[in-house]
A protein has these predicted regions:
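Serine/threonine-enriched low-complexity regions used as flexible
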Residues: 2-13
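Feature responds to low-complexity, polar/acidic, surface-exposed segments characteristic
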Residues: 12-98, 106-127, 134-159, 170-184, ...
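Predominantly extracellular/luminal carbohydrate-interaction, adhesion, and secreted-enzyme modules
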Residues: 131, 163, 191, 217-218
């Protein structure tokens, strides 16, 4: 909705009271999920640094984002859109994230810059990340709503940001802004990825600390704690109902072995005969 604030006049009073627009938190609900993302298996999809830290306030690169979503595709989608080639001048077959970039480009999820580059080591902004995340959902272009005070009607990213808001992937800040050109943090990115996967972690329903991978810069008092634990710990779960929602939140039931994504991608790569081609039988 476009209003940033409202003024209400209490009964029997001549004074007006200002009410800022509330900032709502969304989750993707039933029926609004993605058909090409693996929403069933709760695999971890990021790892920490060699020094043992997760750096939730650190930035994330375009190549890393492509790799995360590539790993989280359904097997059917990955098979259908598999590619090892692309038209970017800075993404050749030797690039560590080439398969991810090529496949997601083939899906139409990501694209590059007007100079023909993709810039895999470049940082990614909040608007760019929103565009990628909402690309996995079927959405329709709607009239400009003005959800955020710093998103103009004619900006290149407006339709993507507003669509991502409508399907419940993103939210803005308490001051009514979205800050589209600010680089997204690792914590913010994981929150959006979890929403895209319809994952609903809650701190009180995780496993005991001793049974999880933990991080010195990610503690239960941090706002991003549950989402970062979700992103870094593979686990089994069951759904908990609340308020008529059968899938209101997830309760972890067991820690699973971490998936070896490098080995997984190698096996998938060798199983294909050609970029975008058939699986070798």
């Amino acid at each position: 909705y476009p209003n940033v604030k409202a003024w209400l006049k209490p009964a029997n009073s001549s004074e007006q009271i200002e009410f800022p627009r509330p900032m709502l938190s969304y989750r993707v609900g039933g029926g609004g999920g993605s058909s090409v993302l693996n929403t069933d298996d709760h695999y971890s999809y990021i790892i920490g640094y060699k020094d043992g830290y997760l750096r939730p306030y650190g930035t994330i690169t375009r190549g890393e984002v492509a790799t995360i979503f590539f790993r989280l595709l359904t097997d059917e989608a990955r098979d259908k859109y598999w590619s090892q080639t692309n038209n970017y001048s800075d993404c050749n077959s030797d690039l560590w994230c080439n398969n991810a970039i090529s496949t997601l480009s083939n899906m139409g999820i990501i694209d590059g810059y007007s100079d023909g580059t993709f810039r895999p080591y470049g940082k990614i902004t909040r608007a760019q990340f929103a565009k990628i995340a909402v690309g996995f959902f079927e959405t329709t272009t709607q009239e400009y709503q003005g959800y955020y005070s710093d998103i103009s009607e004619n900006a290149w990213f407006t339709n993507y940001v507003e669509a991502a808001s409508r399907v419940g992937l993103i939210q803005g800040f308490a001051d009514g802004t979205f800050r589209p050109n600010v680089n997204i943090t690792r914590a913010q990115a994981c929150v959006i990825v979890n929403r895209a996967l319809d994952r609903k972690p809650a701190t009180e329903h995780l496993l005991p600390t001793a049974k999880m991978i933990n991080w010195p810069d990610c503690t239960p008092s941090d706002w991003y704690y549950a989402d970062m634990q979700e992103a870094t710990n593979s686990h089994d779960y069951r759904w908990l109902a609340s308020g008529g929602d059968a899938k209101a939140m997830e309760k972890w039931t067991a820690k699973l072995p971490q998936r070896d994504w490098a080995a997984f991608e190698h096996a998938w790569s060798t199983a294909h005969s050609a970029p975008g081609g058939e699986v070798i039988k």
